[in-house]
Amino acid sequence: VGGSSGECIYQHPDERKAVLEAVMSEAKGKITVIAHVACNNTADSVELAAHAEKCGVDAIASIPPIYFHLPNYAIADYWNAMSAAAPNTEFIIYNIPQLAGTALTMPLLNEMLKNPNVIAVKNSSMPTQDIQMFKDAGIQARGADGFAVFNGPDEQFVSGRVMGADGGIGG
């Protein structure tokens, strides 16, 4: 809820909260609900993460901060701040470098795998080989069942599955 298809970047945090509340009133306990909580600043992202946990989502997800190319440690701090605001909720890294301007690197993924709430990557990068690299890193850190990689673009679903994606989160 509230990801790329939901035009999250263009909505005010209050609008995003209202949408999530409406979705949860209908879907909670019936389907898996993942709330995208990224904003252009950490404070709003943290606020949305805490709200999502309060609403009872199954997981939160986030792209990296957009526009400026930040070092890995700054992106990790941004994501970990959101995760800390929702300590009982799983966290999914959303890799979409063609729109976010920053790609998930292996050093950044390995740093994020130190956070036990990080359970998956949604990969929307064009090289489907990234799926295999992310999956291998997750298996190495968490074991075969402890980490998932989801394919993003619908048109790459089959090739993503061939590369090891556990499923897809399309738009």
Language model segments and positions:
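Active-site beta->alpha loop and helix N-cap motifs at the rims of alpha/beta catalytic domains
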Residues: V1-A103
